[in-house]
Amino acid sequence: MPKLQLSVAMGDYDRTRALFDGTVQIDGVEPTYMLLSPEEMFFRAFRFRDFDICELSLSSYLVKHAGGNCPYIAIPVFLSRAFRHTAMYVRKDRIRRPEDLKGKRIGVPEYQLTANVWARSILADDHGVQPQDLSLIHI
């Protein structure tokens, strides 16, 4: 029986390299691997449905799924795991603690970006800074 041909888009991570270099095989599948940046991969997946299997932004996936407009099915594999506490950068002449962000303008590339969801949760849960306390600006 011929192997199932599937396109697989993923980032170049230590956690995916064994698939890409062939060390780990997928039984019954002849994959065509594409190493792409997350931005390109997510855009092409959601806009053009370019891949059979791909890494996706969890929050963008949930937005699409909730709207009944997602062609993908999620599986519980998280390729990028990081604490997002160090992912916020502020002007050192104005912000001394997270609570100082209340009422400030904050630039974000996308509201639903998974890292931004984490950051808002950290600010709310750990520091009492609710999303409505911030002025989020699309950059």
Where are these regions (language model features)?
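Small-molecule pocket liners
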Residues: 82-88
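Flexible hinge/capping segments at coil-to-helix
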Residues: 90-106
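Conserved small/polar residues in nucleotide/adenosyl-binding loops
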Residues: 137-139
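Pocket-flanking alpha-helical
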Residues: 38-71, 94-96
